[in-house]
Amino acid sequence: MDDWPERYSAALELDLTEEEGDAILGLARDVAHATERRFAPLSAYLAGKYVARRVAAGANSADAVHEAQEVVGRLLAE
């Protein structure tokens, strides 16, 4: 089911670029490998909430995803 992200985002009537999908998957991967695996889905969910809040405030979604990645990187480096 390689087309799962496209199918799911379409069913939710959301736009998901390949870059955004790759970034969120990378974020989840980093969390899964550096902490407990079970935190990866929760981290992806929280990143999504953060992105939605930033976009509602006028930010670009790609920039907001990048910001969420930076926060993960910073926290995992501590």
Segments and roles (model prediction):
Residues G58-E78:
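C-terminal structural segments of small proteins and small subunits
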Residues A28-R38:
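A short glycine/serine-rich beta->alpha loop
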Residues E36-F39, Y50-A62:
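Short helix-capping/linker segments at secondary-structure and domain boundaries
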Residues A47:
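Amphipathic alpha-helical interface segments
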Residues M1-L14:
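Active-site-proximal helix-loop elements at catalytic-domain edges
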Residues D2, E18, L25, R38-P41, ...:
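Electropositive phosphate-/nucleotide-binding environments in soluble metabolic enzymes
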Residues E13-L27, E78:
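Acidic-glycine-rich active-site phosphate/pyrophosphate-binding loop
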